[in-house]
Swiss-Prot record:
The aminotransferase activity with phenylalanine is not inhibited by 2-(N-morpholino)ethanesulfonic acid (MES). Homodimer. Its cofactor is pyridoxal 5'-phosphate. The keyword Transcription does not apply. Keywords: Aminotransferase, Pyridoxal phosphate, Transferase. Transmembrane segments: none annotated. GO terms for molecular function: histidinol-phosphate transaminase activity; L-phenylalanine-2-oxoglutarate transaminase activity; pyridoxal phosphate binding. It is an enzyme of class 2 (transferase). Belongs to the class-II pyridoxal-phosphate-dependent aminotransferase family. Disulfide bonds: none annotated. The lineage of its organism: Bacteria, Bacillati, Actinomycetota, Actinomycetes, Mycobacteriales. This is Aromatic amino acid aminotransferase. The hydrophobic nature of both the substrate binding pocket and the N-terminal lid is responsible for the discrimination of a polar substrate such as histidinol phosphate, while facilitating the binding of Phe and other aromatic residues such as Tyr and Trp.
Amino acid sequence: MTARLRPELAGLPVYVPGKTVPGAIKLASNETVFGPLPSVRAAIDRATDTVNRYPDNGCVQLKAALARHLGPDFAPEHVAVGCGSVSLCQQLVQVTASVGDEVVFGWRSFELYPPQVRVAGAIPIQVPLTDHTFDLYAMLATVTDRTRLIFVCNPNNPTSTVVGPDALARFVEAVPAHILIAIDEAYVEYIRDGMRPDSLGLVRAHNNVVVLRTFSKAYGLAGLRIGYAIGHPDVITALDKVYVPFTVSSIGQAAAIASLDAADELLARTDTVVAERARVSAELRAAGFTLPPSQANFVWLPLGSRTQDFVEQAADARIVVRPYGTDGVRVTVAAPEENDAFLRFARRWRSDQ
């Protein structure tokens, strides 16, 4: 006889991360190719001296540093810290939704939204994208008296697109004030072309808006798992109530604080990624691919039924990309030489079609 487990888990898949194949070029996980700055490495080294002690469970110094980084309108009580922004997504579901409640988001989007909602016993309302972008009008039309939470993944993972700043502001105004809106900005540092929303302004103006950000992408700390939420103190207090104690390590906290101190230098690196993104996108289009305009550190190839063939042939060429069923492939913008290898493969594959 086996233990009796919750029936909601029976149909849920186990999360499968982007593959790592020794000797292959990994373009599957949207990691930065840049390692930590010397000042961040030094902070990490110093933090190892106290790993025999539990970390600061309240992340007091990190919250204070984040509040300073966000500006004079924010204080530590506006900030929650988690083990990556994905854990904060889970916490948001926990504090808003229970059995029979609804959580709205565009689809396809971050693939952990549906299982996180189902584990809570709530119902995921997956609204089809329009032109690979969140359709905010369609999402608004799905709101009912059972809606508790709305995720807006912006830029959207995996399709790389953003919603317009004005459209997002109008959407927030239109959503009933008792429904929490989570703007998931894991890739916000890569937005250009005047498409970056004033999400912090939305937090200031609306008590039901929370913004999620991470140190995993532009800051290059994916292995240390640090994310944070910005919102009304009541929302932040609720998130802290369901935070699993001590899950943000002392090393991660120290690295994040040092990264904020070096934010200008770290964020300048995103310009290099954006330039490569433009080059990769242009060369893919020249080769005959169709792809939406990217505002992230990856591109989206909507290959449909050809997705699996592309992924398998890429693997044969020692290049690992991220498939999404029969929808398409997400490809990280990496170092120039890695991008060149991918482009050579992509041209060969396209010429064989």
